[in-house]
């Protein structure tokens, strides 16, 4: 038997059936740890294809613990792992967009490589993570926002996590979070940390099915729209994938350096997010407005980035986003 055990040799491109069987076997406990590790590393070395990414995501979708989301619900989620250690932009964007009357089923986890992931920052703000995940269905219906904790929503991943940790490098599972939202949303703003992979990832999302999503990556390898330079953007609809470029100027915002939105630990990031929602101006606000504008386009709430910036800014300046966060924390 080869070192890959029940898996096909990943030096050759896998077709859909091969990839689907491989990831089903992996998630269902049909291979040894060392075989899984060898397969994942070889796949990463060769470079994952659209077919393989979609098959892995579908295998995770088939095994998650779901909730029902209202029509038009969106997710704003990044793959993480970009190494820039910025403030929690997608978390703040989720709150701001929900305050614009767009239901948001936020899928996230604790930090893997940064100091503070979405779950860490929200906990530091006072959100009871266990209760939030348990009451996600009710919170989404009552508040228009919920947090779906990846650590509990994907029980099949519990065996894979220590293997990923032992590998100690990026694998296909670093791309999976946004593609396996337990609310099964069909509108997403997805950030990835690999600009060159935007078209591949977008084709995988198209294969899985979406009403309107955008896959974004800053030229610096940022897993969100960057104010520092250009951005790769893939617009994904049932008709296919359309590539475009975007910069802060398109949203009427100034260029900002990544150093201006450098984050810290959960407490640091939570304080920054609270100040943002209380009306503090600066680079963090601009980054949130830029990404929120893109999310509002995905939701069908606005047609242009400048309109989206105006709507998001209004939700902050009128205190709607801060009030929503307070209600979310206090929800019983």
UniProtKB/Swiss-Prot annotation:
Annotated InterPro entries: Anthranilate_Pribosyl_Tfrase, Glycosyl_Trfase_fam3, Glycosyl_Trfase_fam3_N_dom, Glycosyl_Trfase_fam3_N_dom_sf, Nuc_phospho_transferase
List of residues binding Mg(2+) 2: 223-224
GO molecular-function term, one example from the UniProt record: anthranilate phosphoribosyltransferase activity
Residues annotated as binding anthranilate 2: 164
Cofactor binding comment, as recorded: Binds 2 magnesium ions per monomer.
Sites where the protein binds Mg(2+) 1: 90, 224
Annotated residues for binding of anthranilate 1: 78, 109
Functional description taken from the UniProt entry: Catalyzes the transfer of the phosphoribosyl group of 5-phosphorylribose-1-pyrophosphate (PRPP) to anthranilate to yield N-(5'-phosphoribosyl)-anthranilate (PRA).
Record protein name field: Anthranilate phosphoribosyltransferase
Designated gene of the protein: trpD
């Amino acid at each position: 038997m080869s070192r890959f055990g029940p898996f096909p040799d990943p030096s050759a491109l896998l077709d859909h059936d091969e990839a689907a069987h491989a990831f089903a076997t992996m998630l269902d406990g049909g291979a040894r740890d060392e075989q899984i590790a060898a397969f994942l590393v070889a796949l990463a070395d060769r470079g994952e294809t659209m077919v393989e990414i979609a098959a892995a995501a579908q295998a995770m979708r088939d095994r998650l613990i779901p909730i029902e989301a209202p029509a038009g619900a969106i997710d704003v989620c990044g793959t993480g792992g970009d190494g820039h250690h910025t403030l929690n932009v997608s978390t703040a964007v989720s709150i701001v967009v929900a305050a614009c009357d767009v239901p948001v089923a936020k899928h996230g986890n604790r930090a893997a490589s940064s100091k503070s992931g979405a779950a860490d920052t929200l906990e530091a703000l006072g959100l009871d993570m266990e209760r939030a995940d348990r009451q996600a269905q009710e919170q989404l219906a009552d508040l228009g926002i919920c947090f779906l904790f990846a650590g509990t929503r994907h029980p099949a991943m519990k065996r894979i996590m220590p293997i990923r940790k032992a590998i100690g490098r990026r694998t296909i599972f670093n791309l999976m979070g946004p593609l396996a939202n337990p609310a099964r949303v069909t509108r997403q703003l997805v950030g990835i940390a690999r600009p060159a992979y935007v078209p591949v990832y977008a084709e995988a999302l198209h294969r899985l099915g979406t009403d309107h999503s955008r896959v974004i990556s800053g030229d610096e390898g940022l897993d969100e729209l960057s104010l520092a330079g250009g951005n790769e953007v893939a617009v994904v609809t049932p008709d296919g994938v359309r590539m475009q470029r975007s910069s802060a100027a398109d949203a009427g915002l100034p260029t900002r350096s990544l150093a201006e939105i450098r984050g810290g630990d959960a407490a640091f990031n939570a304080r920054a997010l609270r100040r943002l929602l209380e009306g503090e101006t600066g680079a963090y606000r601009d980054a949130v407005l830029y990404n929120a504008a893109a999310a509002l386009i995905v939701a069908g709430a606005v047609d242009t980035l400048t309109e989206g910036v105006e709507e998001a800014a209004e939700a902050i300046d009128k205190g709607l986003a801060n009030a929503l966060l307070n209600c979310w924390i206090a929800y019983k």
